[in-house]
A protein has these predicted regions:
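Glycine-/acidic-rich phosphate or pyrophosphate-binding loops and their flanking alpha/beta elements
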Residues: 141, 149-155, 431-436, 482-492, ...
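Acidic, glycine-rich active-site loops and adjacent beta-strand->loop/helix elements
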Residues: 78-83, 168-175, 198-203, 233-235, ...
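Gly-rich Lys/Arg/Thr-decorated short loops/hinges at beta-loop-alpha junctions or inter-strand turns
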Residues: 114-120, 162-164, 196-198, 291-303, ...
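Conserved small/polar residues in nucleotide/adenosyl-binding loops
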Residues: 712-718
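Long, well-ordered, tryptophan-enriched scaffold segments
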Residues: 199-417
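Cofactor-binding active-site loop characterized by glycine-rich and histidine/acidic residues
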Residues: 11, 15-23, 27, 31-39, ...
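A glycine-rich helix N-cap at a beta->alpha junction
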Residues: 95-104, 189-195, 222, 547-561
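Non-catalytic terminal/interface segments that mediate subunit docking, oligomerization
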Residues: 390-538, 544-552, 636-642, 646, ...
Length: 722
């Protein structure tokens, strides 16, 4: 589809081109200052990816100073962090001191961070590929918050949907999680999603394979995306229209990526006839080529041959403003790594830094006098006041600097729980959600569940039967319509409260991240619950860490876990997952043994997921049915089991030994106690509900040099029974 758009105003284009140069300068200087000028206390290289930043300055300038609206959200590729912070500085949303402290304590972060940066990062990025997928799932969550009537009741107005935008490096397409996410997006008919590929054709160790763009086009087209190649800038397009221009275009099209990069480096280094020699050799006798070459000296020819669309402000703006619908868009923007700097095109430029001599050359080229390095608006081709006014009035800059805190969700004093005298924690989990699903509470309306194709086997089935599966299209349950008996009745509609995912754990955790940030992103607080088999946490561990790193709030229910997985065989055992629960920041892990413990922990979890200093929760549950205690859950007991442990059977005075357990092994523990109590009458049983909380409380006490909170009321000797 061809869409006609109004041309960019010449005055605005001139301003944006000037701002682009300032963004390039500030981002390069930020890295230079951190590595060569700032005092180093340890002599370690700081780094900062100057070349990766230089390739994206045109696109980022176009986005933040012209294209983005308040409701749009952006994931900036990790290695473009200096560009992002330079732009926020020019928008008045970042301080000079933080730029000077880039990659040091209290300064701007190496990679954009929601939790550590202070200038409005929408999505943390890094590891590579995760932020890209995050925009896709955020788009799905945006649709959910807009379509779910129960969620939208508190909202006075449903605003126009924003575009979820990922500015990504081409090497990120090597990450498999991107393709897993794309497939899930296709299933859900994802919309309002832009992925802008910085196609500089260079990665950490060299140059990418020729023809990669064709594969990219095929991948995206196959799942319903509109693919927009941005290859040639306006200068080249004008020359292509001349006699011999078609042949010149074909020469560039056929030029291997590594040769093009090498010629780019030679050209920017000022080598005589860097481009002219191969063009004269390869295009000898082609009518019109001689005239084109004669009309350009070496500098002009270098500027022409590197006039790729990703560095042409007019071409970039035309492409972005040509989007006429909410279909997902993939922009393949041809760029040059290190563009406009002495590093341009060199195969080793990924981790390369301009040395002092190169920076002097670059400073002279950018016309930045000494003492003006950190100026946001001076030394441009436009007046400083004009530049400042344009920046401060950018559409994106109308976004409030601080995200609004959505109202908290009311949690009842007790969660509904009806259980048999013998039951498992997994069954109790399903029972609690089923009871909630039958009510009309604020809590029930804000719970959203998701699972990677293990919904039924993790006991979410009754919840889904009551609440439905989220879908942009209404789809009936065919088995039910055909009167085929089934325990499941899955209706799909826009108010469903379950996202059914394929078997891809990365998708689960990034989906939970997007749902868990729905409050700050879209103004609607949700309480997401994700389920999976406990061993497969390891399949998506980097994505889990990514979700926790940006302080997304969710409940992760891993079930079955522990010994109840024995029939699954050796590859399905959850051996190391307790260590994941202990080691993962932002995630509190629990392993209750009884149904009443689970109800208390889940209620606390829903509160913690909303607390300023709270976090996410990881529950390891079991399918092993055990006899339930007949007891009153008093506040003191609730407090102890939330803190991590309580006395299941208190020891008597003089006790020097105790049996300590966690989870569904309690029948064996009680049996052992019965066998030992005659010989050791003072013996007690300690129930650990959270080895995570217990350990971190002890660790904190060591750091703070204070007495640990006592759960045992006795000193355990070196000889103990566990």
């Amino acid at each position: 589809m061809t869409v006609k758009t109004k041309p960019v105003k010449k005055a605005d284009l001139r301003i944006l081109q000037s701002l682009e140069k300032k963004v390039l300068w500030l981002s390069m200087w930020m890295v230079h200052n951190a590595n060569h000028l700032r005092q180093s206390v340890d002599g370690l290289k700081v780094g900062g990816h100057q070349a990766s930043s230089a390739s994206i300055t045109t696109i980022m300038t176009a986005l933040y100073f012209n294209v983005l609206k308040v409701q749009d959200r952006v994931a900036v590729k990790p290695h473009a962090s200096p560009v992002f912070h330079a732009i926020q500085y020019m928008l008045g949303r970042q301080t000079e001191d933080k730029l000077k402290a880039f990659r040091s304590l209290g300064g701007t972060q190496s990679y954009p961070s929601r939790t550590k940066d202070t200038d409005g990062v929408d999505f943390s990025t890094g590891s590579v590929g995760l932020g890209v997928a995050m925009t896709l799932f955020a788009s799905m969550v945006q649709d959910y918050t807009r379509l779910n009537e129960a969620v939208n009741k508190p909202l006075a107005k449903v605003n126009k949907p924003g575009r979820m935008i990922a500015v990504m490096g081409d090497a990120e397409l090597d990450e498999g999680n991107i393709y897993e996410a794309m497939l899930e997006g296709w299933k859900y008919d994802v919309r309002n999603l832009w992925w802008i590929i910085d196609y500089n054709r260079q990665s950490l160790d060299g140059v990418v394979s020729d023809g990669l763009f064709r594969k990219i086009q095929d991948f995206f087209a196959n799942v319903g995306w509109n693919v927009v190649p941005l290859k040639y800038g306006k200068k080249l397009e004008k020359v292509f229209a001349l006699q011999g221009g078609d042949t010149l275009r074909q020469w560039i099209d056929d030029c291997p990526n590594d040769l093009y990069s090498a010629l780019t480096f030679k050209g920017q280094s000022g080598e005589k006839d860097a481009w002219r020699s191969p063009l004269k050799k390869d295009l000898r006798g082609v009518h019109g080529i001689k005239s084109i070459l004669e009309d350009h000296d070496d500098n002009m020819l270098h500027a022409l041959m590197t006039n790729l669309a990703g560095h042409d402000m007019e071409a970039v703006l035309e492409a972005f403003h040509s989007v006429a619908d909410d279909r997902p868009q993939c922009f393949i923007a041809y760029t040059i790594k290190g563009h406009g700097t002495p590093l341009a095109g060199h195969r080793d430029n990924h981790a390369g830094l301009m040395n002092l001599e190169q920076m002097d050359v670059f400073r002279s080229k950018m016309q930045i006098p000494e003492g003006s390095e950190w100026s946001a608006y001076d030394n441009l081709l436009i007046e400083p006041e004009t530049a400042k006014k344009f920046c401060l009035q950018a559409p994106f800059n109308k976004r409030p600097p601080q995200e609004n805190e959505p109202p908290k969700i009311t949690i009842p004093d007790n969660l509904p729980l009806n259980f048999r005298s013998s039951t498992s924690t997994q069954a109790s989990f399903g029972n609690i959600l089923h009871e909630l699903s039958r009510g009309n509470t604020d809590l029930a309306s804000r719970i959203v569940t998701t699972s990677p194709d293990v919904t039924v086997s993790t006991n979410l089935g009754p919840w889904v039967n009551q609440r439905g599966v989220f879908s942009l299209d209404v789809r009936n349950d065919v088995f039910r319509d055909e009167k085929v008996a089934s325990a499941q009745k899955w209706l799909r509609h826009g108010t469903g409260q379950h996202f059914e995912l394929g078997i891809a754990e990365n998708n689960l955790f990034i989906m939970l991240a997007a749902l868990g940030l729905s409050g700050p992103l879209f103004g609607t607080r949700l309480l997401p619950i994700g389920t999976l088999y406990d061993p497969f946490i390891a399949r998506g561990l980097d994505s889990l860490n990514y979700a926790c790193y940006q302080d997304a709030r969710f409940m992760l229910v891993a079930t079955p876990a522990g010994i109840t997985l024995a029939p699954e065989g050796g590859a399905h055992q959850s051996i190391s997952s307790p260590l994941i629960g202990i080691g993962q920041p932002g995630l509190s892990s629990y392993e209750p043994a009884y149904a009443d413990e689970l109800a208390v922990i889940m209620r606390w979890a829903f509160e913690s997921m909303q607390a300023e200093n709270g976090g996410s929760i990881y529950l390891r549950l079991s399918t092993r049915a055990i006899d339930q205690p007949s007891r009153e859950m008093k506040p003191e007991l609730e407090n102890q089991l939330i803190k991590g442990a309580y006395w299941h059977i208190p020891p008597t005075d003089g006790a020097r030994i105790a049996i300590v357990y966690s989870g569904a092994v309690v029948p064996e523990v009680i049996e052992a106690y019965e066998q030992l109590k005659e010989e050791i009458p003072e013996l007690g049983i300690m129930a650990i509900t959270s080895y995570d909380r217990l350990y971190h409380d002890w660790q904190r006490s060591q750091v703070e040099n204070i007495e640990a909170v006592s759960y045992t009321h006795l000193t355990l000797p070196t000889r103990s029974l566990v």
